[in-house]
């Protein structure tokens, strides 16, 4: 058994309470202890060990005595306890004295020495520092300038004071009919670089805006915008919207004397920036107007310096870049007269640093005239949003809404022919093969193939190339625009596709919906929806890449099974109007029994071979799929 742990303070208290305490004689120290402090500690430690040994022996003896004398009288036991208690002070007095000396030394020690010891210990745990920089963070998005309580009111009041103006496809005029309203230099540039005839949307806009603009500007150059009001246009793609808003802007700005930022054009993509810039630049030939662009590819510092040194009359940019310039102070909106939103539905769905509120707040800060109608807002889209809350956030003033004379949401060009390819569900896996066969039947075309993702674009292009190598189809020029390519490579592919005029070979560009907006390539003959678009709005933008500028075009829709056919009929076709004398959608694919009864046997004989797969073709097709799988696995490694 182990001895009870010794408590020095308890012994001191017991010795004080004794009536006749014994005189304690401390142990004498040796001379060597007094001379050398270190030797004193050694002897004391040796004495401690001896005393501890004696104590342990005494405890063991006392335990043995207790066991042997368990049957003795109580008086003897009491005498033994008194003797043991009287022996403790003699044994441990030296320990107590040494303990008290240690406490006294600690009180006298310099506090700085203790701190230094702690610092030395902490220094060992210090990690070497590196030259790290703080990660740049985007600016805090400001709250909406519109009170939340007013949002519900705006939803119902967005179209309260809107004047609706209808137009139709028959409204085509000569630009020379507007020679009284258009500057001679501007009219000459239009006829030389664009066309002598107007498109319907151009006709109705020029008829409505030009007389009011010219009259108001002649009366007051400062407040002419109030008589005009804002403009909202819903027009199909390829209908000449860019030229429609460029002509009125240049008609007014061509009369200016000092260059100030008076027109701001906001577009959703960089591709559209270049196309809008080209339109303005061609129209502004022979004038002193300065047209500038701003996009993320350029250095922000260099653009700021350029804008401050030589302020442009017209600036074309994207929402994110615009916010950067507004926050840096390089763009001042004090003299702004025209604000254009091209592809407005996509712009309003984007929230680049809350660009819309940033722009409106900047207008309130910079403009000295805070009255409504201090600028003319022009909103253009092929699928103008029906979300009135988003539109009302732009705070329109006496808006005029220009829409096609139709009860449907959207309108397709008159010369666009649509074909639906009905593919049975059991043959879904052969969809790339059917696409290749369709391409073989189309001669001398330039086709855009739309898929749902970048990965699908990359894999479909690779599989088509492999099938062509295995002689499953004719030789084509097949390229894809996807995220695996660099921006420069994608731009090169698009430019080569646009500039290639070789009509002897089918040119195919596989892409996603990025190419469905803002790509002005007038000679695209065909559009193929390999994956069904998710909405009628997306369908309009895809098909709008062809049949532009009143030219012919074809759109193919690959519909698998009854589900996709029903979706196209109920969610896409129901929202679209077509001209009575224009092209109507037709079925090209495997017909059901009802269609076979209605259609002639001649057309049936033409269609069925497209979807027929013989055993030999099936075997080669499976080899192509295995080759694609091996290629994908190799690229992953």
From Swiss-Prot:
ATP binds at residues 235-242. Its main location: nucleus. A motif (Q motif) lies at residues 198-206. It is an enzyme of class 3 (hydrolase). The keyword RNA-binding applies. It catalyses: ATP + H2O = ADP + phosphate + H(+). Residues 222-402 form the Helicase ATP-binding domain. Residues 1-93 are annotated as: Disordered. InterPro entries: DEAD/DEAH_box_helicase_dom, Helicase_ATP-bd, Helicase_C-like, P-loop_NTPase, RNA-helicase_DEAD-box_CS. This is ATP-dependent RNA helicase DBP6. Gene3D superfamilies: P-loop containing nucleotide triphosphate hydrolases (3.40.50.300). Its EC number is 3.6.4.13. ATP-binding RNA helicase involved in the biogenesis of 60S ribosomal subunits and is required for the normal formation of 25S and 5.8S rRNAs. It comes from Vanderwaltozyma polyspora (strain ATCC 22028 / DSM 70294 / BCRC 21397 / CBS 2163 / NBRC 10782 / NRRL Y-8283 / UCD 57-17) (Kluyveromyces polysporus). One of its GO terms (cellular component) is preribosome, large subunit precursor.
